[in-house]
C-alpha cells in the first residue's frame, strides 16, 4: 500500500507550509477581492464558504495532488462498488446502498443487495404507518403515544440526533425517548414519564447480546410486565432492530416486528438502515425518504465530482492541512440552531471512532497524527463558554460554524441576531483585532495613554483562526441527509489519506473484555482475579462499601 510519508506531495506540502505559515488571512482577503467567490461551493441545499482558512491556490493544488497520490478516487470507487475495504473484518462498507435512490444494483459476494434493502425499508414504512395512524394499539387498545429507543453507540446517537434536529417535522402525538446508559438512572427517568399501555419500546442491537442494551431492555420488559401481567402483551409493545431472530423471539418480540440490517452497515453509519426506525416513526416514511434523498444527492456529488470541486473532499483536505501540518489536535462543531445541539456528539463518534487509529491498513505504525478530538456545542452557548480559547488561546483549532438561512421560528428578531453572530464570529476569527485598532478604540473612549498600553495586549486578537461556514438553506430532512453524508465522506477521505481502516473499532473491545471479568468479582460470581494494584484496590473499595 501507499504510505503517506512516501508520497511526493507530502514533502511538497511541508515545504509550502514553511513558506506560507506566516501568511495572514486578513491580508489574503485584502489582496484578492475574488477570494470568497473561489473558495465557495454549493451542493443541493448546502453552501460551504471555506475562504476563511489558512490556504491559497498553491495549498489547495498540493492537497489535491496528495489526495490523488494517496489513491482517494480509486478507494471511493471501491466503496461504492461493494469491495471489502473494511479489511480487518473482511466486510464491504455500503451505507451508501441504504440511500441508493436510483436502485441501481450494488453487488456484494455476487448478490445485489438492493432488493433486501428495499424490502426492509418497505416493512419499516408499513410499521410506521400503523403506529402513526393509530391503527397499532397496545394491550388495552390504546394508541401509542411514547416511543422508547434502547440502544447504544450508533444505535442511539444517530436516531437521537436526527429526531432532535427535525423535531418540527415530528408527529404531534409521539414523544421520543432514548436510553443508552446502563447506570439505571436514565432508564428510570424515562419510565417515570411514560405509561405501559401507550408505550412502544424499540430494542436496537444487531446481535441482541450487547450487554448495556440487553440490561436496559430486560429491565424495561420487567417494568412493562409488572403492569401488563400477560407475557403475550410484550408483542404489542416491543419491536427489535436485530439479526438474531432466535434471541428476539425468546425475548417475546414478534419476529414480524424485527427489522434487520447487515454486516456491511457499520454502527456509526447506520441511521439510514433499520436503526433509523425511530426516525421513521417520528418523522413518517415520506420525510425519512427525503432524508435518504438528501444523502443520495451528496453521494452522487461525492462519487461523480472531480476532487477540486468536491465538497467532502475539500473539507477532508483542509482538515489534513491543520491536523498534520499545523498540529491542530482538535476540531470544533458549532451549530447555530438549538435543534442541532446533538450534532457535535454524533460527529464526535463518526470521526473519532472511525479515524482514531494508530496503525495503517498493513499493520504499521502510522507515524503521523490521525483523528483530531471532536467537540462542540451550539454556537451561541459556545460564544459564552469556550470561544474565548478559540479567539485568544494558544491552540490552532479549526471550527465548523453551521447555520440555517431560513427562520425556524416566527419570533421577531431572533434569527437575525443568530445569523449576525454566526457571520460576525467567522469574520472575527479571520480578522482579529490589531494593537493599533485597540489603541484607536480605547482612545476614542477617552482613556489615558498609560491605561491604554496596559490593556492593548489583553484586547488584541491575533485572528488568522480558521473556520468553515456551512449553511443550509433550511433545516429539513433532505438537507440533514446531505449534511450527515457530507461528514461521513469527509471522514472516509481522511482515513484513505492516512492509510487507515475507518470502518473497524477494535479499541472498543478491550474494555468490554476486562469488564466481564471484573463484573464477576463485583457480583461475587467469581473469586478474585489477578489485576494491577490500583484495580485491586478499586474492586476492594466497592466490595467494602457495599457490605455495609
UniProtKB/Swiss-Prot annotation:
It catalyses: alpha-D-glucose 6-phosphate = beta-D-fructose 6-phosphate. The keyword Cytoplasm applies. Pathway: Carbohydrate biosynthesis; gluconeogenesis; Carbohydrate degradation; glycolysis; D-glyceraldehyde 3-phosphate and glycerone phosphate from D-glucose: step 2/4. GO terms for molecular function: carbohydrate derivative binding; glucose-6-phosphate isomerase activity; monosaccharide binding. Its main location: cytoplasm. It is found in: Cytoplasm. Keywords: Cytoplasm, Gluconeogenesis, Glycolysis, Isomerase. One of its GO terms (biological process) is glucose 6-phosphate metabolic process. Catalyzes the reversible isomerization of glucose-6-phosphate to fructose-6-phosphate. Belongs to the GPI family. This is Glucose-6-phosphate isomerase 1. It comes from Neisseria meningitidis serogroup A / serotype 4A (strain DSM 15465 / Z2491). The lineage of its organism: Bacteria, Pseudomonadati, Pseudomonadota, Betaproteobacteria, Neisseriales. The gene is pgi1.
Amino acid at each position: 500500500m501507499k504510505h503517506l510519508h512516501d508520497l511526493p506531495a507530502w514533502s511538497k506540502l511541508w515545504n509550502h507550509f514553511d513558506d506560507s505559515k506566516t501568511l495572514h488571512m486578513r491580508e489574503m482577503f485584502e489582496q484578492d477581492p475574488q477570494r470568497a467567490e473561489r473558495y465557495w461551493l454549493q451542493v443541493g441545499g448546502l453552501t460551504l464558504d471555506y475562504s476563511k482558512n489558512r490556504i491559497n491556490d498553491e495549498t489547495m493544488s498540493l492537497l489535491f495532488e496528495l489526495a490523488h497520490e494517496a489513491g482517494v478516487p480509486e478507494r471511493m470507487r471501491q466503496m461504492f462498488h461493494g469491495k471489502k475495504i473494511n479489511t480487518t473484518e473482511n466486510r464491504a462498507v455500503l451505507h451508501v446502498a441504504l440511500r441508493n435512490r436510483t436502485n441501481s444494483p450494488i453487488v456484494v459476494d455476487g448478490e445485489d443487495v438492493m432488493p433486501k434493502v428495499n424490502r426492509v425499508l418497505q416493512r419499516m414504512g408499513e410499521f410506521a404507518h400503523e403506529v402513526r395512524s393509530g391503527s397499532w394499539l397496545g394491550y388495552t387498545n390504546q394508541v401509542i403515544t411514547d416511543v422508547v429507543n434502547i440502544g447504544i453507540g450508533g444505535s442511539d446517537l444517530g436516531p437521537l440526533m436526527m429526531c432532535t434536529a427535525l423535531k418540527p417535522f415530528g408527529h404531534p402525538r409521539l414523544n421520543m425517548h432514548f436510553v443508552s446508559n446502563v447506570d439505571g438512572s436514565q432508564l428510570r427517568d424515562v419510565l417515570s414519564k411514560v405509561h405501559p399501555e401507550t408505550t412502544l419500546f424499540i430494542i436496537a442491537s444487531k446481535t441482541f447480546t450487547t450487554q448495556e442494551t440487553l440490561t436496559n431492555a430486560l429491565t424495561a420488559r420487567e417494568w412493562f410486565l409488572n403492569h401488563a401481567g400477560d407475557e403475550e402483551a410484550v408483542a404489542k409493545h416491543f419491536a427489535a432492530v436485530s439479526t438474531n431472530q432466535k434471541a428476539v423471539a425468546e425475548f417475546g418480540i414478534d419476529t414480524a416486528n424485527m427489522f434487520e440490517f447487515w454486516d456491511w452497515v457499520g454502527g456509526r453509519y447506520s441511521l439510514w438502515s433499520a436503526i433509523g426506525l425511530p426516525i421513521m416513526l417520528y418523522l413518517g416514511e415520506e420525510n425519512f425518504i427525503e432524508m435518504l434523498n438528501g444523502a443520495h444527492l451528496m453521494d452522487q456529488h461525492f462519487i461523480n465530482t472531480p476532487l477540486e470541486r468536491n465538497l467532502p473532499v475539500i473539507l477532508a483536505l483542509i482538515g489534513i492541512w491543520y491536523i498534520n501540518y499545523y498540529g491542530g489536535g482538535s476540531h470544533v462543531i458549532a451549530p447555530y440552531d438549538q435543534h442541532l445541539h446533538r450534532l457535535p456528539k454524533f460527529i464526535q463518534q463518526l470521526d473519532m471512532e472511525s479515524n482514531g487509529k494508530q496503525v495503517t491498513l498493513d499493520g504499521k505504525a502510522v507515524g503521523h497524527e490521525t483523528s483530531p478530538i471532536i467537540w462542540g456545542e451550539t454556537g451561541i452557548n459556545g460564544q459564552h463558554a469556550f470561544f474565548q480559547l478559540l479567539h485568544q488561546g494558544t491552540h490552532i483549532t479549526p471550527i465548523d460554524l453551521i447555520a440555517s438561512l431560513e427562520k425556524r421560528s416566527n419570533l421577531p428578531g431572533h434569527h437575525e441576531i443568530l445569523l449576525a453572530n454566526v457571520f460576525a464570529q467567522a469574520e472575527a476569527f479571520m480578522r482579529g483585532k490589531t494593537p493599533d485598532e485597540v489603541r484607536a478604540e480605547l482612545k476614542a473612549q477617552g482613556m489615558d495613554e498609560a491605561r491604554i498600553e496596559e490593556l492593548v495586549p489583553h484586547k488584541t486578537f491575533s485572528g488568522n483562526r480558521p473556520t468553515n461556514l456551512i449553511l443550509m438553506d433550511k433545516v429539513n430532512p433532505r438537507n440533514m441527509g446531505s449534511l450527515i453524508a457530507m461528514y461521513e465522506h469527509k471522514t472516509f477521505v481522511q482515513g484513505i489519506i492516512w492509510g487507515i481502516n475507518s470502518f473497524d473499532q477494535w479499541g472498543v473491545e478491550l474494555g468490554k473484555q476486562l469488564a466481564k471479568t471484573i463484573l464477576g468479582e463485583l457480583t461475587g460470581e467469581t473469586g478474585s482475579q489477578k489485576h494491577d494494584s490500583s484495580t485491586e484496590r478499586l474492586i476492594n473499595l466497592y466490595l467494602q462499601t457495599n457490605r455495609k
